Regions:
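Histidine-acidic metal/acid-base catalytic patches
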Residues: 2-11, 16-36, 84, 89-94, ...
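Short catalytic-loop micro-motif centered on adjacent basic/acidic residues
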Residues: 12, 71, 126-130, 156-157
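Structural motif corresponding to the early beta-alpha repeats
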Residues: 28, 35-112, 121-125, 187, ...
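Short, aromatic/basic amphipathic alpha-helical patches
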Residues: 58, 115, 224-226
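Histidine-centered active-site/metal-ligand motif
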Residues: 73, 101, 131, 160, ...
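Short, well-ordered, mixed-charge alpha-helical segments that flank or form enzyme active sites
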Residues: 106-108, 134-137, 162
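S-adenosylmethionine/decaboxylated-SAM
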Residues: 109, 118, 145-146
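Conserved anion-binding
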Residues: 121-142, 153
């Protein structure tokens, strides 16, 4: 019997363009490099998600580029009202995740629980980013998620976990709660081992390249595409 494997999605965070207004051309550029999905950074200078006309434009641009909106990434320190409005884009734009960055655990727990209550009727999952300093090491984040009075998962940041120690161990630690990822383009990560661990724990969601715009976007996307191609080969080998 031949095992069929669903095609893995790869996406790009619009952090690549965060210091600009997000435009049709930006999304077209991401799609032109072969990516299927995007994560939008909820920065009002980047995307004014309070403005229904801007949300409507975003919906149209995504459709034109044939991109899915995987999720919205809410930066740390974002006001609750802005977090809510970023989430409410899901009333018009189908999306899977709202990625949040936790501060102090007690306050973060209240905010995540509040957002989870708003997100559930919209079919959106809350993912706590593992790069949050207060949630390191990985075991601390797992404890945080498991003690919430609401459902939430983990957005696993590979670069941050690598800096923190044993990456494979961290992947295994968060495995039961892993629902999305952030992936670097440049790193010293042992990808064969990391991706084997990802396959082992059963994660089938997208790999989202989360890259700051320190160089030309086109060059960065070309590099991300090469990393994607390497990932695809390694994932096939580890099946």
């Amino acid at each position: 019997m031949v095992r069929t494997v669903a095609k893995r999605q790869f996406g790009v965070s619009t952090r690549l363009y965060q210091h600009q207004r997000l435009s049709r051309e930006h999304l077209g550029e991401i799609a032109a490099h072969g990516f299927e999905t995007v994560e939008v950074v909820a920065d009002r200078q980047h995307v004014d998600f309070h403005n229904p006309a801007v949300v409507a434009d975003l919906q149209q641009w995504l459709a034109e580029a044939r991109l899915e909106l995987h999720g919205v990434d809410v930066p740390i320190g974002t006001a609750s009202e802005d977090s809510d409005q970023a989430l409410f884009m899901a009333r018009r734009l189908p999306m899977r995740m709202l990625v949040v960055h936790a501060g102090k655990p007690r306050e973060a727990a209240r905010e995540v629980e509040r957002l989870a209550g708003l997100a559930s009727p919209l079919g959106v999952a809350i993912a706590v980013d593992s790069s949050s300093d207060s949630m390191s090491p990985a075991g601390s984040l797992v404890h945080f998620v498991e003690t919430l009075d609401a459902a939430a998962g983990i957005c696993f940041d590979f670069a941050h976990a690598q800096r923190g120690g044993d990456l494979v161990d961290a992947i295994e630690t968060v495995s039961e709660h892993l629902i999305t990822t952030h992936v670097p383009v440049d790193s010293a990560i042992d990808w064969p081992s990391a991706l084997t661990a990802v396959q082992k724990v059963g994660y089938e969601g997208p790999f989202v390249f989360d890259i700051a715009g320190r160089m030309a976007a086109k060059e960065t996307l070309q590099r991300a595409r090469r990393v994607r191609e390497r990932f695809e080969k390694l994932l096939c080998m580890s099946i």
